[in-house]
């Protein structure tokens, strides 16, 4: 049977509200007939139609879309055997740049001047009366701060932290709520607005009021009546405002304080507010944060001070939900931590200044509470103020609404646990933006983390909306001289803005590497076109610092090491200054990589002159690396793992010395007892550098090593996510790290070294795209260690790839499901290749 299995608008299967004038419509197909191909797809949107004969998406290019309108979408597909299939969906246009009738409002009497804390949440209220039958009603809302909307006491929508985290000086999202069925005729519309990222304390300096001096609200209720008339009720000076709501404190780091006995009083008129910024206000285009998995505690303990400790057996980003019978005035506190002290109490040392505490003052009777304006990174929760026997408690995971589209499993259960840790690390740090960690006073959009992790992330999740949203901010935050800030959105931490033409290797590389990873996973040119000028400016800034040398030194990146991260958190040296001291190697390899990748992108976009220019630049940088930083015979002048990994993976060594360089890397690995020695730049690539250069056995010995530092050491000592530091806990469960110049930079939920996940999919499982978007892909497992079988799925624009292999009795059995519209090259152990069209196949060969 020929079927349409997926039909999306702007990557959403349902519920899309967009301001895009040319929304993208995507689809995937399935068939039980081998070799099935799409012959024609007729796409109809309203009165417009077009035909698609290749690819899996098309942009709407019909008559201008009207605002506030629902459009039907219909797809009629025909395969090459004449079978047909039909699917329908719909989307809604938002405001489409319609001027707002509502005005920004705030409380001018609230003067928020305290440092390093967040403001008291504001509550806005409007009584609304309607007296005619309603055909359709939509609420459009946004804020400076983070908000929740209620209609007659009922929360609207499922999103946490609306309107989301963006580069507020450039972009601000608004949300759309269908309230047609909720309006009664006499209604109360209420908003609670906390400080969030725009006004509240943020970054490790706890800077506040970065974007606005106080919270502000912009909203419109647009009602279409049955008689054809329309009424718009917008925010203005007739709205009421108060700071006496039940949410007494809300801070992204410190947590939330809620007083259920608090009656909202002191209502007074709001007033128009003039913002310090003028962002483009656009319908949601990212992936909003929502509640996902709910976990119950697996163990309950009592700390020495009497605090009840709950173990949820999983480190995560989220909140607790408590339910109990309380008395008015009773105070319950919930603290959060990733690890315990030896005495069983919560270890909150590594939260630094983040208090990560929820405080709840009870009313009489049964009650349920869960924070709405903060989140924490935790495995353990400590509760005081209520007896354990009287309390029901759950941990609720919060992360962006991204589809979990990939899976990996093999015969080694420790690797399966590593895969789980990687995906939980991703979910914990996909909280509206890609963050570094979810627990301490940071949770920032560090560019280096997602730069190295994005290929792994895209094997596990469908991230088009999530990453495209963040990349808009990368583009917006780029410095005039080309550098990319280390954290995006900047929001109070602007390094390297202080340096002319400043660029930071591997961190700034995110502007090239993340779009490239997204293109490889999806085949979409949109992100490459959007980011191409940004990439060009960035590579130019990198070249500025590489241009100070003379002769063969000209293409060596010469920025002082203190302005780099270098071989960040490499476990073979103990100090931050030592990681940074390796920057000449990491930065020069970075420039080779970004310029080489930019050459590929230029070619894809049809910019042939640019492609030739960047390809030549990449070659010159590679030559300089080998001339200046090696002896010319495959040995680096300073020997450490990353110094070999990067040029091997990036193919920088001449062919006649590559094998020698790989042997030298193997010697370092063997000398280190197959333990990892790379920092952020080298860790994603070390297993590829070994396996793809004839040393798969060494790669597997490193992958399967259980001694510290290694991926499976973390698994062996009980990790449930990936750590920032390889030696975060010793065999006794205690942190052995002393003063290393990083100010207690120890996180147990940091996905960067989980970038090894790409190796699990590409080499252990063996699925890798050979053409962007997996239109063509190969299934070529690299067998090693004691692994006897592996299976997994990979989500693609064409459908789901399913692949599995198993070795038994000297024979290898390989099975693969190839989506309609794609082609798979199966590589057998003998290196023989079989090219397969769509369908399901089983191939056997001598192992």
What are these model-derived regions, one by one?
Residues 137-141, 151, 319-338, 373, ...:
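Alpha-helical support elements that line or immediately flank enzyme active sites
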């Amino acid at each position: 049977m020929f079927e349409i299995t997926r039909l999306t608008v702007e990557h959403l299967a349902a519920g899309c509200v967009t301001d895009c004038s040319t929304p993208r419509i995507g689809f995937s197909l399935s068939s039980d007939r081998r070799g099935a191909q799409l012959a024609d797809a007729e796409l109809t949107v309203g009165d417009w139609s077009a035909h698609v004969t290749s690819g899996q998406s098309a942009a709407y290019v019909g008559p201008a879309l009207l605002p506030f309108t629902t459009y039907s979408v219909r797809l009629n597909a025909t395969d090459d055997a004449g079978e047909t299939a039909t699917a329908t969906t719909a989307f809604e246009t938002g405001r489409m740049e319609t001027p707002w009738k509502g005005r920004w409002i705030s409380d001018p009497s609230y003067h928020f001047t305290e440092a390093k804390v967040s403001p008291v949440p504001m509550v806005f209220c409007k009584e609304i009366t309607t007296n005619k039958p309603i055909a359709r009603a939509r609420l459009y809302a946004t804020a400076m701060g983070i908000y929740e909307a209620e209609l007659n006491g009922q929360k609207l929508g499922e999103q946490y932290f609306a309107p989301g985290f963006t580069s507020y000086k450039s972009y601000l999202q608004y949300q759309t709520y269908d309230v047609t069925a909720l309006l009664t005729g006499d209604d109360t519309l209420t908003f609670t607005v906390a400080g969030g990222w725009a006004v509240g304390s943020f970054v490790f300096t706890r800077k506040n009021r970065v974007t606005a001096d106080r919270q502000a609200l912009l909203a419109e209720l647009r009602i279409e009546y049955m008689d054809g008339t329309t009424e718009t009720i917008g925010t203005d000076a007739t709205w009421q405002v108060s700071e006496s709501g039940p949410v007494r404190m809300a801070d992204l780091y410190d947590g939330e304080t809620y007083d259920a006995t608090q009656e909202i009083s002191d209502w007074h008129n709001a007033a128009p507010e003039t913002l310090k910024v003028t962002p483009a206000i656009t319908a949601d285009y990212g992936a909003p944060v929502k509640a996902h998995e709910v976990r119950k505690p697996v163990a309950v303990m009592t700390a020495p001070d009497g605090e009840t400790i709950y173990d949820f057996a999983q480190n995560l980003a989220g909140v607790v939900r408590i339910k109990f019978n309380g008395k008015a005035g009773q105070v319950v506190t919930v603290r959060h931590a990733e690890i315990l002290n030896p005495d069983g109490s919560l270890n909150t040392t590594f939260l630094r200044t983040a208090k990560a505490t929820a405080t709840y003052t009870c009313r009489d009777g049964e009650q349920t509470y869960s924070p709405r304006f903060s989140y924490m990174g935790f495995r353990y929760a400590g509760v005081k103020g209520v007896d354990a026997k009287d309390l029901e408690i759950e941990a609720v995971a919060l992360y962006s609404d991204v589809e979990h589209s990939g899976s990996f499993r093999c015969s080694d259960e420790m690797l399966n646990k590593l895969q789980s840790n990687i995906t939980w690390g991703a979910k914990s740090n996909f909280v509206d933006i890609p963050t570094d960690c979810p627990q301490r006073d940071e949770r920032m959009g560090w560019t280096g983390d997602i730069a190295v992790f994005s290929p792994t992330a895209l094997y596990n999740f469908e991230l088009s909306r999530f990453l495209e949203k963040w990349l808009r901010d990368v583009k917006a935050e780029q410095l005039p001289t080309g550098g990319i800030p280390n954290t995006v959105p900047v929001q109070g931490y602007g390094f390297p803005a202080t340096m002319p033409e400043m660029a930071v290797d591997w961190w700034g590389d995110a502007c090239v590497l993340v779009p490239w990873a997204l293109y490889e996973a999806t085949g979409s040119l949109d992100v490459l076109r959007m980011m191409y000028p940004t990439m060009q400016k960035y590579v130019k800034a990198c070249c500025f610092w590489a241009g100070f040398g003379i002769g063969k030194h000209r293409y060596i990146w010469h920025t002082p090491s203190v302005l780099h991260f270098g071989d960040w958190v490499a476990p073979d040296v103990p100090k931050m200054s030592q990681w940074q001291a390796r920057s000449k190697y990491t930065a020069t390899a970075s420039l080779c990589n970004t310029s080489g990748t930019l050459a590929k992108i230029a070619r894809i976009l049809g910019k042939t002159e640019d492609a030739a220019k960047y390809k030549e630049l990449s070659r010159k940088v590679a030559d300089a690396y080998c001339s200046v930083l090696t002896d010319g015979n495959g040995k680096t002048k300073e020997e450490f793992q990353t110094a070999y990994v990067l040029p091997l993976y990036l193919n920088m060594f001449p062919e006649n010395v590559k094998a020698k360089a790989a042997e030298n890397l193997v010697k370092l690995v063997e000398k280190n007892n197959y333990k990892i020695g790379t920092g952020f730049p080298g860790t994603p690539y070390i297993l590829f550098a070994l396996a793809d250069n004839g040393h798969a056995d060494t790669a597997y010995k490193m992958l399967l090593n259980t001694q510290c530092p290694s991926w499976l050491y973390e698994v062996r000592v009980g990790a449930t996510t990936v750590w920032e530091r390889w030696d975060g806990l010793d065999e006794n469960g205690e942190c052995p790290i002393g003063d290393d110049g990083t100010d207690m930079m120890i996180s147990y939920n940091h996905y960067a070294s989980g970038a090894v996940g790409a190796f699990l999919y590409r080499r252990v499982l063996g699925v890798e795209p050979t053409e962007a978007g997996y239109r063509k892909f190969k299934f070529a497992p690299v067998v090693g260690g004691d692994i006897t079988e592996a299976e997994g799925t990979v989500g693609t624009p064409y459908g789901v790839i399913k692949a599995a292999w198993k070795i038994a009795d000297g024979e290898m059995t390989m099975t693969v499901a190839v989506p309609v519209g794609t082609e798979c090259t199966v590589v057998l152990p003998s290196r023989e290749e079989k090219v397969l069209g769509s369908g399901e196949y089983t191939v056997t060969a001598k192992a």
